[in-house]
């Protein structure tokens, strides 16, 4: 899906921050996160949604019913790629793993960066190197200071 939709988003002048496909029984949700240095407004989401809808209608990559949602990543932005983990180093993060690592699946702490294919997180004075392929979900924890 990334290979199909990212070029559409980028051709409009936005960054394709990430794509989620959430299966919810017979109806699913395709969520496309877009970003821009000047921020994202509802008009930006509408413009990108129209273009993506056209591509999806032609290519028809999803056989079931779904809803398309185009959104800003927001303050609690999800992290999808190693590059995003590098860009967000120094932020507080919440990470959920697909399976336990060192006896736990949930980590909340300071994102230190990336080493090879591992995301480095400091939790309670202990540094964890979490393999990127084990990460199910990761989000920035917004600061309000």
Swiss-Prot record:
| Alphabetical UniProt keywords | Cytoplasm, Ribosome biogenesis
This entry carries the following GO cellular component terms, namely: cytosol
Q: Does the keyword Transit peptide apply?
A: no
GO BP term, pick one: translation
Localization of this protein: Cytoplasm
Give a yes or no for keyword Protein transport in this entry.
no
Pfam families in the cross-refs: DUF150_C, RimP_N
Where mainly found?
Answer: cytoplasm
Similarity field:
Belongs to the RimP family.
Which PANTHER family does the UniProt entry name for this protein?
A: RIBOSOME MATURATION FACTOR RIMP (PTHR33867:SF1)
Q: What does this protein do?
A: Required for maturation of 30S ribosomal subunits.
Under which name does UniProt file this protein?
Answer: Ribosome maturation factor RimP
Q: Which gene encodes it?
A: rimP
